[in-house]
Amino acid sequence: MTQNIHQHRILILDFGSQYTQLVARRVRELGVYCELWAWDVTEAQIRGFNPNGIILSGGPESTTEFGSPRAPEYVFNAGVPVLGVCYGMQTMAMQLGGHVEGSNEREFGYAQVEVKTNSALVRDIQDALSATGAPLLDVWMSHGDKVTAIPEGFETVASTDTCPFAIMANEEKRFYGVQFHPEVTHTRQGQRMLERFVLDICQCEALWTPAKIIDDAVNRIREQVGNDSVILGLSGGVDSSVTAMLLHRAIGDRLTCVFVDNGLLRLNEADQVLEMFGDNFGLNIVHVAAEDRFLNELAGEDEPEAKRKIIGRVFVEVFDEEANKQAEVKWLAQGTIYPDVIESAASATGKAHVIKSHHNVGGLPKEMKLGLVEPLKELFKDEVRKIGLELGLPYNMLYRHPFPGPGLGVRVLGEVKKEYCDLLRRADAIFIEELHKADLYNKVSQAFTVFLPVRSVGVMGDGRKYDWVVALRAVETIDFMTAHWAHLPYDFLGRVSNRIINEVDGISRVVYDVSGKPPATIEWE
């Protein structure tokens, strides 16, 4: 009998903090399953989930404002430990009889809290000692309001000069509140505090590990599809690749992968995908050479969103045609991951600002009569990569820089032509190769080349030429929500520019993009 890896579980209620998904990832890193739900869930839903503990996230609202979010009352009557983080601590304090006030002294950034009372949450945890020998913790604050009176039954565990209740605890009921963010790396002992809460106080077992996740996924796939066949669109990206490997392990040759070469891929990418998954791993792959079809559909179109829609529509058409040829196929597999599910749920309930719709959720043709298999839908991206390694996929493929779904279709500015794609592919390959050679590839978060639809005069030998311009883009970021342009060495940039202009006939000038996000986006289109 396979162990139930979902048996021990934490429920995280989301009050809108930008860090909430990070809380969930940190809990998962401890080896414990958790789910992220909107703050206004019902008692019946919480009972149905049956968590070992509940975490109340931070949030941008003020608890002192009328109508601001509150935790369901059942949270405090469920008989399980509760940890309130920042806003979560404030709503806990107010709902249990304490007091919160707005403060003129907004605390944002690094702070040092002094531990006053021993607590299960911070037992044996410290960063330094005060002059009087009290333990000190380096933490990351981000709040305006603060708790000014704690509820009955609570005690002050830690404080700062401006925040009298930085940590509060009711040890008997196992309720804890922290006015800082333990999930961010700036709180140096934050992960140890979460470990104290999840493993010690909630008494969860670390059952959520890559090997066990794979076993669980394989069993669930077999249970879901039985003896049926499955079809998957394989792009060579992380999510579809790991999905393919899981399905292949579960059902072997009953998986058919459709690889659509749309002519918008990186240099030699189609050959690499076919060699890795077909030759090395023995998957059934249908290779559809559809470059002409995509480029014909894109001809004359220069508006970025219209190009995205054309590429998406043609992909669905091509994939649908191939699926219809596979008469025995009953299931469609997709590489949907947990953040896609969270984003779609938030979009449906109107509880989050959605920047753009995700291609994996809701992008299927309505007439497709296949069941849906989504083996990664409980996993964050970092977890997908870890199980990819466990399944034997190469590190450099799993940790490659992100590549947009529409591919070079949004890296060739304006109208997309084969000539432009071919030039861009070669220029981009040189940039990436040089980043690897200089040991800079893993020091930047994303790097790529953009084709600009402008010509520039150049001099080659005794002659002048009038050729195309490309831009190099490299950024450093933690979450891709904001990014800094990467300060690559001048001699490195000079070397890349030299190689591109000399080796790629048709390019006369190379520029470097020094725009941050905001105001610019990472991709140009």
From Swiss-Prot:
InterPro entries: Class_I_gatase-like (IPR029062), GATASE (IPR017926), GMP_synth_C (IPR001674), GMP_synth_GATase (IPR004739), GMP_synthase (IPR022955), GMPS_ATP_PPase_dom (IPR025777), NAD/GMP_synthase (IPR022310), Rossmann-like_a/b/a_fold (IPR014729). Keywords: ATP-binding, Glutamine amidotransferase, GMP biosynthesis, Ligase, Nucleotide-binding, Purine biosynthesis. It catalyses: XMP + L-glutamine + ATP + H2O = GMP + L-glutamate + AMP + diphosphate + 2 H(+). It is an enzyme of class 6 (ligase). Pfam families: GATase, GMP_synt_C, NAD_synthase. Homodimer. Catalyzes the synthesis of GMP from XMP. This is GMP synthase [glutamine-hydrolyzing]. It comes from Pectobacterium atrosepticum (strain SCRI 1043 / ATCC BAA-672) (Erwinia carotovora subsp. atroseptica). The lineage of its organism: Bacteria, Pseudomonadati, Pseudomonadota, Gammaproteobacteria, Enterobacterales.
